[in-house]
Amino acid sequence: MLAIVFIPFHVIHKFMTVPVLDMGSKLSIYPIILGIGCYFYQAFKKRTTWIPKKYVYFVISLFVVQFFSTVNGLLVFPYWSSINIDQFEKLVKLVSLIPNSDSILNQDSNIIGIIWLSIKIIIKLMFNFLTTYGCSLWIISLYIRCKENVFKYFYKGIIGGALLCTIYSIVEYVHLFGGIWASIILTKINPLFYDVASSHNWWPPLFYGNRVRSLFAEPAYLSTYLSIAIPVSIYYAMVKKTSNWLWKLLPVILIIMMLTTNSKTAIGILIAECALASLLLLIQFRKLTSKTYFKKVIKNGIWILCAVIIGLGCNSVLRDRYSIDYDVTNIQDNHIITLKIENTGWMTWNDVENYQLTAAWYDKQWNSFGRVNVTIPQTMRKGDTAVLTIDLPKLSDYEKYSNVVIELQKFGPYETGELAGQGANKLTLNIEDGHLIPLKDLQNEVVDMSAIASTSNGSNQQRFGMMRVDYNIGKEYPILGVGGNDLKQAYVISNIPDSLKHNAEVKLWIQSQNENGIFKSSFPVISEYPHQFAVYGTLGLIGFLIPSGYIICQLLGLYKKWLHIDQELFWKVFSLVVGYFGLMVSFIAGTTMQLYLYWIMLGTMISLLLSIKNEIL
C-alpha cells in the first residue's frame, strides 16, 4: 500500500535516488524493491513463483526484444567518436584512482567511454525491467496469494495519496487566490519534497503560475494521477458506509483539481473517461431495471456535474489571474517610455511581492537586448492606476532591434516570473518611419486547456514537434529502434526541424546538451507511443501495447460475468477499467516512467481479470 500512497512523490531529492534505475527518483521505489526482494526470498524458499507462466513468458520475450534492440543500437550507433570519459562523472572518479590515470585518460578515453556506456546501458535495461514489469508480476503474485486484499490495499493506497494531494492543494488554492501566508508555507515545504530547479536550471519550479499541480512537479503529472484517483474515489464513495458525505466530497475536489490544472492532458483524459463511462453505463442501463442502479447513477451524476461546473468556474478565474491595461502617454527619443497602467483584474498586486514592468528591445527572431525592470512602488487593487517611466538603452539604428515588448512580472521573495501566461497582456511597440509606436494589438499567452489540437498554444508546439522527432528517428530504424532512451539522445538534435529550434524550451534543451554532452543533459520523453517506436522500433511498440490489448480482449470475452449480473462487481470493474483507459490516453502526452502508476495498474488489471474468472473480487 505504501508504494501506491507514495506515487505523488515522484521527484525525490538526488541523495535519495536509487542509481542505475530510471524509476530511481520515485519514492515508491523503496517499498517496491522491498516487496520484490521478499517475493524472491519466498519463491526461492517454497520453490514456486505463484505467477501464471504465460505472463512470465511474455515479460521474458519482451525483455529479449529490448535486449536485442539495445545490442543492435550499440552496434549501429554512429556517434562513438563523440563518446569519452569526461561525460561520465563516476567513471572519471574511478579512473582517477588508477596509477598513471592521466595517460589512460589521454590515450584510451574513447575506448573506455564506449565500454562503460555499453555495460551501463545493458545493466540499466535489466534493472529497469525488474522494477517495472517485475513490479506488475509481483502484484499478480500478491493477488494469487492474498486474493481480495490486493484490491483493498490498492483502493486504500489511491485514496490515501489522493487525500494527501487534496490537503496540500487547499493551501495551494489559497496561494493562487492571493494568500501571502500560503505562499510562505509553500516556499518552505516545496523544497522538502524535491530539489527545486535541479533540471535545466528551472525544473521543477517552486511554483507553477496559475495552475494547480499539488504534490507533483507539474500539472500534467497530477492529471495523469487523477485519471486513476477520480474513478477510484467515486467507487469508494459508493461503497463506503461511514461518513459517506465526506467520501462523496473527495471526488468532487479531485475533479475540481483536475480542471484547474489547466492542462490539455487533463481535458483529454476527462473526455476519454467520460466517453467510456457513458458507454458502459448505457449498456448496463439497457440490461437492468434496478432502482438501486438508477439511484446510484443519478446521485453520483449530480455530484460529478456540480464538480465540473465549479471546476470550470475556478479554471476561468485562475486562468485570467492577472489583467493589466496600458496607456502610453509619452515617448522620448524612441527609448524613454512613459505610460499609465491600471490593474483591471481581481488579483491585488501587493508591494511586498515586488511587481514590476519589464521591457526590452527585440529582433525579428525575438531575441532580447537591453532589458530594463521598473518596480511598481505601491500596492494596486482592481481599478488602481500608476504612472511609470521606462528608460531603455538608446540605439543608433534599428536594423536589428526594431521591437519593444513591455509586460508585467513578479520578482518577489516567494514567486518570480513573467505573468503573461496568467492573463496579463503584453504591450508591443515597434519602429515605423523612424518612430517608436505602440501597437493596438496586445499579446496574450494564456494557456487554454481546451486547445488540445492546437500546434502553438501552451506546450503543444514542443509536444507535437518532439513527437515528430521521435517518429522520424523510428523511421530510420523501424524494426528494432535505436536501442533505448540513452542512445536516442544522440539522434535528437539532428532530427529537430528548423521551425522547432526557435521554440524557447527546445532551445534550452539544445543548449544544455551542447554544453554538457549527450549523456549529461537529455531531452525529456514527451509521448510514450512515438518514444517506444523510436527506441525499440515496431517490435517494441507492439510489445508495449500487447498487455492493454490482452486486457481489452479478456474483458470483452468475460463481459457476461461482470457487465450484467452483479452490480457490485460491475462498479468495481467499471472504476478500474475507466481509470486504466484514461491512463493509457494520458500517455499520448506523457510517459510510463513519469510516475509509478502504470506498472502498478498493469498488475492490478491482470489481477482483475483473474478475479473475474473466479468471480471473486
Language-model regions: role of each:
Residues Y79-I112, G178-R211, H435-N460, D486-Y529:
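Interfacial juxtamembrane loops and adjacent helix segments
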Residues L75, I167, Y173-I180, W203, ...:
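A membrane-periplasm/extracellular boundary helix in multi-pass inner-membrane enzymes
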